[in-house]
A protein has these predicted regions:
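Short boundary segments that mark the start of a structured unit
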Residues: 1-168
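Single conserved hydrophobic/aromatic residue that forms the stacking wall/gate
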Residues: 166, 173-174
Length: 174
């Protein structure tokens, strides 16, 4: 993200200051936390160290956080499929883990009656561009009933913003 090697600063006779240059600061497109460069003065000759011998320079990230959203806004399947993976995408990779909460609602009954999935938090690891929420244990019962829905709602992201917040998954009787 920058170039700065250990070295020696020479302040010429008669001068009262010198300059250390942090070169090559990279303006990348990767969303990341601010970064710091710490410069420490040590071992002076013909001078003594003052009280301010350490300088911290902060490289402020100027990239937007990625957008987190469902890969699609709806899907469907027969109750005989046993599980359904729902993909959540990031608009770009990031150097930070992204978390997003999801709430589960709809006309299907959770807790193992029609499916198994509780409210939760999805984590998409740094460098990845998608994650998966799995509606598990979809029950293939013999009860005659209409199509049922599971609605997932994304909320409270960290290190990202939310775009499409809802996904409706339909379960049809087989």
């Amino acid at each position: 993200d920058y170039t700065l090697a250990n070295g020696t600063l020479t302040i010429n006779a008669g001068a009262t200051s010198g300059t250390i240059t942090i070169a090559g600061i990279v303006d990348d497109s990767l969303d990341e936390a601010n970064e710091t460069v710490v410069i420490t003065l040590s071992s002076p000759s013909n001078a003594t160290l003052g009280t301010d011998s350490v300088h911290t320079y902060t490289i402020t990230d100027n990239d937007n956080a990625p957008v987190v959203e469902f890969n699609t806004t709806s899907s469907s399947g027969a109750e005989s499929v046993s599980s359904k993976d729902i993909t959540v995408d990031l608009s770009a990779a990031t150097a930070q883990d992204v978390t997003v909460n999801y709430a589960v609602t709809g006309t299907a009954t959770g807790s193992g009656t029609d499916y198994t999935l509780a409210n939760g938090t999805l984590t998409i690891s740094a460098g990845a561009t998608s994650g998966t929420i799995t509606i598990a244990g979809i029950v293939d019962d013999s009860i005659t009933e209409g199509s049922e829905s599971v609605i997932l709602t994304l909320t409270s992201p960290s290190n990202a913003t939310v775009s499409y917040t809802h996904l409706r998954a339909h379960e049809t009787n087989s």
